Each structure stands twice: as C-alpha cells, then as structure tokens.
C-alpha cells in the first residue's frame, strides 16, 4: 500500500512538472528536455557498463548536450540573446563534428580490450537519448510559424493514453503474449487497447486544437505503435544489463528511461510524420 501511495504521488508530481514546463515557456521546456537528456544518457551508459562495455561517458554527454543546444537554439524565439545566431550555430556544429572523431582518438589512450564497443555504445547513447530529445524541440512548431506548446502536450497525452489503456485492457482480457522474451506481461489485447486509447486521445486533441482530425488520428497511431516498441527496446537493454529499472530518480517509477522510453523511440517517427503530413 505504501509503495502504491509513493508511486501515485510521485507520478502526479512528475506529470505536473512535465506539463508545467512544456506550457510555461520555451525555456522551461528546453530545461526539461536538457535534464531528461543528461539523466537519460547517464542511465544508458550505466546500463551499457553493466553489460561489459566501456562508453566514453563525458565525451558522449558533451556531444549530446551540444546536439541538443544546437537544435533548441535553432527554434528558440529568443535566440538573439545568444548573439549572431548563424555564427553560433556554425561554431557549435563544427564542435559537434570534431567530437565524433575525437572519440576514436580518446579510445587510443583508454587501452580498452574492445575499443569498438566503447565507441559504439558512446554513439548509441547519443542516438538513443540525445537525438530524440533534440527533435522534440521542433514538435511544438512543426506545421506552424509560431510556438504552440499544446501540440507537445497533446503528443504527451497520446503516449500516456496508450500506456493506460494498454495496461487496463491487458490486465482485464490479455491472453496472447506479445513479446514474452522481453516483456512477459505485454499482450496483443493490451497493444490494440492502447492503440484505441491513443486514437481516441488523438481525436480529442484534433478537436481541441481545431486541427485536421485525420492527420491527428494518424499521428496517434504512429506515436502509439512506436511507443510500444520504445518500451520493448528499453526492456531489452535492462534485461541484458540484469536490472529491473534503469535508475531510481523517480520514486516508485524508476529512472528517466523507465518513464520516457516510449517518447524516445516515437519522437523521430512523430517528427518525420508531422514534417510531411502536418
């Protein structure tokens, strides 16, 4: 009972922080994504270390932060406070490009038994955590000339609706296992229940935002389907590392990757979908 109370309270606080940061301003949204990036990359590199890999944590984190800052600066309304935006962006991009070959140079002095593993897991952390969070910077402005945080809020609600309905339907009538090797409790019934919940939320979002209904129904399907795969991918990493949770930052919920795994994998797909459809 105590664990349920802790989980519920921390979940409510987390939801309030996430939604509040998105709605408050571009800068609070950017700060939220930056915190998730650092926490998520730290957890991923810890999981990689438990599997016998030796990622270059500092280099990876710096590259991830630079990638994020470049993308956030590109979409920020207040970019003028950073000076010459074009020059700053060019310098940042050049620095990021130099960090990639720097990984190979650093590996020369680490004397690791498996340098390819060290370099590979370092780059994986950037691709798995930093890239999706960087792309999220664009979601509130894709298809619009102005910043609209409610688009991001709607995307979050679609992911949450998918999780809730998948859990409820799976617990009630779930019989056919979806991916027992990685997640024994996931069922096909829960998967389709989650899709239905996500589509319903997508329809509601379209009505509230006065947007194209069919476009949002498609977005909901894309977000929900890839979100489930995101959960399975994180389960794959945790199972290989022999741990239940990626971290303990959020009481009763685990770490950043445990709570935002669906967003990490779905964000690139949602970004591309919105770019071409919305």
What are these regions (language model features)?
Residues 266-267:
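C-terminal-most transmembrane helix of multi-pass membrane proteins
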């Amino acid at each position: 009972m105590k664990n349920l109370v802790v989980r519920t309270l921390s979940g409510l606080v987390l939801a309030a922080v996430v939604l509040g940061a998105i709605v408050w301003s571009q800068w609070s949204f950017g700060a939220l994504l930056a915190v998730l990036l650092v926490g998520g990359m730290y957890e991923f590199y810890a999981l990689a270390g438990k599997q016998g890999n030796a990622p270059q944590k500092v280099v990876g984190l710096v590259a991830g932060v630079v990638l994020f800052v470049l993308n956030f600066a590109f979409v920020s309304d207040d970019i003028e406070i950073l000076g010459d935006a074009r020059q700053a962006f060019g310098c940042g991009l050049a620095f990021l490009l130099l960090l990639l070959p720097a990984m190979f140079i650093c590996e020369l002095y680490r004397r690791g038994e498996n340098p390819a593993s060290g370099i590979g897991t370092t780059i994986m952390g950037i691709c798995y955590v930093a890239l999706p969070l960087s792309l999220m910077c664009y979601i509130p402005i894709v298809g619009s000339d102005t910043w609209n945080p409610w688009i991001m809020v709607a995307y979050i609600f679609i992911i949450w609706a998918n999780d809730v309905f998948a859990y409820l339907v799976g617990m009630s009538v779930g019989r056919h296992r979806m991916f027992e090797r990685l997640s024994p409790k996931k069922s096909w019934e829960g998967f389709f229940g989650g899709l239905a919940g996500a589509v319903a939320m997508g329809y509601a979002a379209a009505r509230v935002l006065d947007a194209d209904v069919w476009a949002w129904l498609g977005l909901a399907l894309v977000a929900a389907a890839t979100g489930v795969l995101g959960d399975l991918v994180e389960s794959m990493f945790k199972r290989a590392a022999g741990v239940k949770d990626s971290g303990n930052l959020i009481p009763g919920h685990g770490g950043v990757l445990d709570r935002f795994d669906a967003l990490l994998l779905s964000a690139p797909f949602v970004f591309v979908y919105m770019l071409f459809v919305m």
